Amino acid sequence: PAVVRWAIKGVTDPKVYVIDDQTPYGTGLRDAANDYITAQKVNKVGSDSVAQKTADYSATVAKIKASGANIVIYTGYYPDGGALAKALSDGSWKGQFIGGDGVLNSAYIDVAGKAAAEGTKFTAPAVPFEVVANAAQQAAFTKATKLKSAAGHVYVTETFNATNVFLSCIAKGNTTRDKIQSCVSAGTFLTIDGKTKISFTFAGEVKGGAPVGGFQVVNGEIKYFGAV
């Protein structure tokens, strides 16, 4: 649902075209997007299913342009998403291109090219590390990774939180798989900010669902716009 909400935000008379990459991830996100589109009566003008590593997107671009779509939701991964975005730009299509967390990668801009990537939107159940980490945490990240910033790296915050959840359970003497699973599903844990609490189902899902963030390429960089 979030990918559709973020896609149509700010677009007058949205006309949506949905494309998947035929992978389990891509078809799953496609189905979720289509369900929301149907439920909210969003105007969907077309869809396509294009295999990964497609060399020529000209036929797909032609279909999109013929449909009158002003939004393309791509549910695959960034190498193909970037190639499709470039093909759309080269084909003079004007509209909003958006992908999920499979497309949210700084390398997407390199694949698509800065001009084609500009304005692209993304969604992911993630909050950028540089947004929530304090100075000490960011310094520790730089020391451990040799990276000046976590910007452009998805799920750093979530990895930080997950690691500390496991360490917390281990510190309590839970050192087997079964005991750690029971600890995780029964406990309540603080996240990176030291204030927000999370808990998990036995299957490891965040209770209540993880907030989904909206991102967009602005001036050649991926920016975070909060929960969508």
Annotated model-derived regions:
Residues 1-228:
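Extracytosolic ligand-binding ectodomains
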